[in-house]
């Protein structure tokens, strides 16, 4: 029987695990999570050549899906600046073990991405038994929500943010005599950072839920500073878009704005739930006080 199930049964029976037992359970959770990462890393390394050709190097070619969609959008709207049909740069490896090192690093990153749902589930199954019944009810489906948001952010970073950033950096030119010859480590590092950063950024509703639950955040604060948040989002979109066209900035700003609005709704829902729980608890205490024969108020 898994250790977390034993803990839940023990909690239900009024028994508590010792500190050593908690550490033992956490150790096995970590071992299982690391094992999953290792398995996916090995699989990624086995197929690393196909992964580089079809996935990692795909945004460096003008026939990438995002570039083709932008060209279609440019034809439809008449905004020629949106169309990306030329990426004037070369990739090279300047170290003897450069390509092998990048193969290992890329395999590890891919292993982390694919093992994330299971690794988070292992962490969650350790935390969940220690929550109150009301907290478990509110956080039901946490693994599903976190995984969905993270993977959505990864896809957004790969298909939207990374291609726009690559195009901007590849076509930025100080002088025609300067040729762009990027090292493979720089290219892979850029895609990895942007993709993982977007995956974490898409956790904004989850962060809003946690902060609202512990009382550090409320929907009134988020609504009050909504305009400030929109300005930050627009600045961020302007930095990574390939041209000053408004449409290209909107492509990046829209999902981030939507996430902020969803976070406001999440915070409001948490606040409403906390008020309902407080009222229910107060009513329960009042009923207990009235039913207590030793309570002077019950004799009146």
Predicted features and spans:
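Membrane topogenic/interface segments and analogous intrinsically disordered interaction regions
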Residues: 1-300
